Amino acid sequence: EYKAKIGADFPTDPKEQLMGAIKAVFRSWDNPRANVYRRDNDIPYSWGTAVNVQMMAFGNMGDDCGTGVAFTRDPATGANGLFGEFLTNAQGEDVVAGVRTPMHISEMEQKFPEAFVQFKQVCETLEKHYRDMQDMEFTVEHGKLYMLQTRNGKRTAQAALKIACDLVDEGMRTEEEAVAMIDPR
């Protein structure tokens, strides 16, 4: 399948594989979906894109491993508190694929107590730094927490209003900034 699509054998050299992946990300900046997304979200073409290269963390190496996704607040209601799910002995795609039923993020405290304490601290730090609700992906490998990604989380209109007001009450945003956070679309 790879050869039919690309016209060459899959490279066996890891450096060549990595460079191919990096080039694919940069090429994706010009695909039609990316162009539509930039236009719809007022993102200038000149910003370009970036590639992060990081060591792989494995959540599927036993019962002391796992992976999950979480928000620092409920994206449906805006309620302040961790909201998300995780799976033990799994990789990231397993959480979203629906192959297994994930556990609520609160159950992580029993499965990985030390990693959970650290996770809560990291969540608090990220939200304070970005001054907005965060949507995060993480892996636990043999009890050690690895944060893979964070971004400002998408939310319902109801949640957007509550989060904006709460961030003002918590001293993280001014009233003017909170109003500007609300997407009128």
How should each PLM-predicted stretch be described?
Residues 1, 86-88, 132-185:
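Terminal amphipathic helices with adjacent charged low-complexity linkers/tails
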Residues 1-77, 89, 99-118, 175:
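Extended, highly charged
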Residues 59, 92, 153:
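Short loop/turn segments at secondary-structure transitions that flank enzyme active sites
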Residues 63-66, 94-100, 146-151, 158-161:
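Short acidic, glycine/serine/threonine-rich loops at helix termini
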Residues 74-79, 90-91, 140-144:
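Short acidic-glycine loop/turn motifs at beta-strand connectors
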Residues 75-79, 128-129, 170-174:
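Secondary-structure transition/capping motifs at alpha-helix termini
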Residues 80-93, 122-134:
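Phosphate-binding core of ATP-grasp and ATP-grasp-like enzymes
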